[in-house]
Amino acid sequence: MSKKSTNKTNSKSLGLVTSSLSKIQQIMLLCLPFCLFFSYHPVIPIFSTSTTNFELSIPLLWLLIFAILSLPENFRLYINSLRVVIKAKSHTNKTPRPSSRHKTDKFYPHFLRLFTLIYPFFVTINSIGSPNFLRAILTSGVIWCICLSLLTILQNISQYKTQIGKSFNKNLLIAGTLASAFCWLQSILDIAGVPREFTFLCKGCISTVFGFPHPNGFAIESQFMANLLLAPIFLSLFYLLERPKNHLSKLNSDPYPASKLGHFLRFGLPLFLIATLYLTLSRGAIFSFWVSVFVLFIYQIVKLIKQKSCRREILFRQPLIFSAVVFLPLFFTLSAQGLFTELGPTSHTFFNGVSTSVSQLSLGCIDLAKVFHKTNENNESHETHETHETHESNKLHLSDLNTDAAASVQKAPQFTSYIEESTNIRLNLNRLALSSWRTSLRRMLAGVGLGAAGLTLYQEFPELGSPKEIIQNEYLAILYEQGICGVIMIICAAILFVLTYKLHNKNHEKISIYGRVLALSFALTLCFFSGLPNALHIYLLTPLLFLL
């Protein structure tokens, strides 16, 4: 209550009308972590065109409802700011006098509020001339909903921090744990032969692809499930590596129960979540996680070195801790993937499964199958001559087997090592988009139009095969569709959102290093995919940066 009154006092001193969250909005914020993990299943298909599939998911429904609930309050605040600015301008025109610093400070929040919607207005204008008008309008609508929701959250996060902060973080950990458990269940059911329609596995996620399943949870693909796990992973690492300095703090108090179970969860939950991340075999999310953990490791080392009272054993312990965080779940998941391959429907063995996974994660640089083959090459060549006659007789015998027996023989998986073609397709799309973007100055400045990337690329490069092919890089997609102007606008919007948070939260705390590495991890993953529906969690989990 004191924080809320303090926030109101600060706002009144600035001449700013305050806002507040309704009970429904508070409940929706607490439900947000659970909604985000149902990013595709269940889905409501609306209609489909030659360029786009229009579907409604639970996160999109959450966003739409929250934005609608936020609209009346935001409309009232914007109208008030507009009146203040117009009144101040008319008063200045009548009695011109040098503006004082006090007046500047008084009108600053109103100008800031009015400018926060500059990016949604820009994309709306940009969508008018888009070749893919329907997709453009719907995309601009999603952007409007995101901006309105973020403004509402950032304007109120400080006064509700102690009320919903711990519960929000706890719910995020619970949601991540349940989703991870479902991923392992998906894998087990797939190995047991349960049809894909019942397991919700995508076509490219089943065991016949690599020999072991790489689950997608309730997401459309495994890479999006892996991306969703990043937030609970870094939150669990926060509670593992950073013990709350003030145990009486409502915000940073430990979400785990004060028992042996809580102690086990503190250490086991991060490892379980990271193991699930490896199980998805999403290179984009895994590489982003590795980079962010390395940055976190460097930060911890520098922080300990700066402490004069730091003991050497504590400093030397850090590499062991971070190595355990990264490699223990990796070894566990590799063993599980090998076991799934051994028990799965393909002819591959435990070693083949481990080799395939390592080859994928190393981009083909480490091929255990080739290394093992070279070490046994001499022995195999020596035995080949002695068993030549036996093989010939076996061939004659196999030719006499009936077709039913031949059909029952297990087949090898579709891929047994790093799929270079997958990476080449993504890189080729990026190259084609850049070459198309550079064809005219107008296109470089304003882009091809919101939502028109797939259609434009298909018209200029029919060999792509479908206008539904999109650029698998969010930054490049923004540059191609909205041009340099769009990039500048979105950077300005990000700055305005940060200033809005600082304005409404005068006693704001510095963002925790864990929030920063999470933001870094999210930023890196956007290099591997694009599309607002698949990236909603990146924008809607922004409050987490201020709750740590």
Regions flagged by a language model, labelled:
Residues S2-S22, L261, T500-I513, S530, ...:
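A juxtamembrane structural motif centered on a specific transmembrane helix
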Residues K3-K4, K8-S81, F122-G129:
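N-terminal signal-anchor transmembrane segment
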Residues Q26, A67, P120-T124, C145-L150, ...:
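Alpha-helical transmembrane segments of multi-pass inner-membrane proteins
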Residues P59-L69, V293-F297, A493-A494, Y514-L548:
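Transmembrane alpha-helices of multi-pass inner-membrane enzymes
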Residues P72, A181, S187-D190, L279, ...:
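A membrane-periplasm/extracellular boundary helix in multi-pass inner-membrane enzymes
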Residues F111-F121, F133-Q155, N171:
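Aromatic-anchored transmembrane helix interface
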Residues S417-Q482:
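Long extracytoplasmic/lumenal interhelical loops at the membrane interface
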Residues E481-S521:
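Hydrophobic transmembrane alpha-helices and their immediate junctions
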